[in-house]
A protein has these predicted regions:
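Membrane-embedded alpha-helical bundles that constitute the cytochrome b-like, heme-associated redox core
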Residues: 1-215
Length: 215
């Protein structure tokens, strides 16, 4: 049966979630890095940038939860043939990436809850994000105390997460250009995005570059 055959590529939903989340994470990190480049009193840029950062972060959270659920309920291609320590490292790095994709926006949500701040959602409407239950009834001094401690934690989580992203990208490029085992191309939506077809054994063929036919 086809359902029992080894998978060679990720399905369309997994690929879509992967690339959309990746782009949103890079956008959100770039926005966060831009905050320090402007004067705190810049009323033209900073409020809109903060609002966009928060809205994108919430999108990352929702899509990451969907990605985790999809990952747990659907098959994926097996890891390539490599040494056991490298397989452990690959599994650990993927697990930590999932933790980062959820923990970074949740920690940001905690900071936002402590502010009781109304934000613009992509310029479409203004909305006060729901406060998490443990924070909703805190007194102002207590909220200020936790805000001053959680905001640096949110920043540190983001930096660690971007290091994981850099490691993930480096590993993907290593598999593609050094090992040539097809790990990268199985997450690409179109064959036209690659320079040839990689077999599971790492051998390269010269099949025509055509869009993937629908299954």
């Amino acid at each position: 049966m086809n359902s029992l055959r080894p998978l060679t590529r990720y399905d369309a939903v997994a690929m879509s979630l992967h690339w959309v989340i990746a782009l949103l994470i890079l956008l959100d990190f770039a926005l966060a890095m831009s905050f320090s480049q402007f004067d705190p009193g810049d009323v033209l840029y900073l409020p809109s940038a903060y609002d966009l950062h928060m809205a994108v972060g919430m999108c990352v959270l929702g899509l990451s939860v969907a990605r985790v659920i999809w990952r747990l309920t659907h098959r994926r291609p097996p890891l390539p043939d490599m040494a056991l320590p490298l397989r452990w490292l690959a599994c650990a790095s993927h697990f930590l990436l999932y933790v980062f994709m959820v923990l970074a926006p949740v920690s940001g949500w905690l900071v936002l809850s402590l502010r009781h701040q109304v934000t613009s959602v992509f310029g479409l409407f203004r909305w006060a994000w729901p406060s998490l239950p443990a924070i909703a009834h805190m007194a102002r001094p207590e909220r200020a105390f936790w805000h001053d401690h959680l905001l640096p934690l949110h920043v540190q989580i983001s930096y660690v997460g971007m290091c994981l992203v850099a490691l993930h990208v480096t590993a993907a490029l290593y598999h593609h250009f050094v090992r040539r085992d097809g790990v990268l191309v199985r997450m690409l939506p179109l064959r036209t995005l690659r320079r040839g077809k990689h077999s599971p054994a790492g051998e390269r063929t010269t099949t025509p570059l055509t869009p993937e036919s629908p299954s």
